[in-house]
Amino acid sequence: MSVNSWIKALVDAIRAAVVRRQTNADRPTTTEADDRAYVQNLYRVVLQREPAETEIAHWVAILRRGGSDREVFNRILTSGEYKARNKILPGHPIGHYYSPIVDPDEARKYARIDYGISPEKILGVRISLSEMQEVWGRLSAFVKSSDFPMNKESRCRYYAINEIFPIGDAAILRAMILLNKPHRIIEIGSGFSSACMLDTLDEAQMADTRLTFIEPDPQRLRELLRRSDAKRCTLIEKPVQAVDPRIFEELQQNDILFIDSTHVMKTGSDVNFELFQALPRLRQGVLIHFHDIQYPFEYPNEWVYNRKYSWNEIYGLRAFLMYNSDFAIEFFNSLFIGRHRDLIEKTYAPILKNPGASIWIRKLRQ
């Protein structure tokens, strides 16, 4: 619900309460069903949720004993739950020019996105398809040998039919690990990508590679891990912003920093921390992955207009890379796969079912 709609609904609820008081001054002349509906509507409008049956019964009992509508309304409006919700309401409504939430009408008017733009026309960012072709030459044998199960199987932690980390991303991740043979991987935002990493390390018998997962909500990760994984995995169960940034200085050449976090830049966000604290601390030769980065550094219309995503990480990363000779784009999934579909089909056709949205960057200089 937008802020404007929320305010309108709140005003309507207040007016409804006033009408009830004016027309039912001698309480109670309404039915129990009326009182029940009144309580449900208050919860939906003021607290933005459905009330539990015990909550409905509590407030209906007060109303049936002669309690006023205003009393119930005011008690809900001054509750700790409402105050907790109210403190995070935006200072400016959706659609206001100060709001970071995407206004679809404004986006359609000004975005003018050319998804087929040539890489050399993206100003300030060096994107070399010929260099990606060379990287593909080193990756392709590993990609070709991919054997991901489509559905959950006991032999693997990862399976391709999931809504989080598609097969195209998994195939390139596996190939990057097999090519670079990292001794250490730090992952920010864990789950199916972690499963792919562990399957790959098992396959390559890379028992000495250590993984650190930074994940404040690790339920999905725990469901995918095996008991034996604890020997080489460290789980930091907190937001990356709460982690000592010196941990990123421990990564060495060909080690991997894998980022798949909230995709949102804002005051105190994980994406800000990653761009401003983690990346500058990396040593030369470290390989960096960002997920959900689509070419040409724009989000698909489906994400913006239908799913209503107001992500902005992609623009922060683009700005970070502009005129930045300390980092280089090594591989850009959506760009390369989109331009070389015939090559991908000959190498490992399942990628074309869902190419994914990964970008791989390398730190060139300290």
What are these regions (language model features)?
Residues 11, 27, 83-289, 293-366:
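A short alpha-helical cap/connector motif
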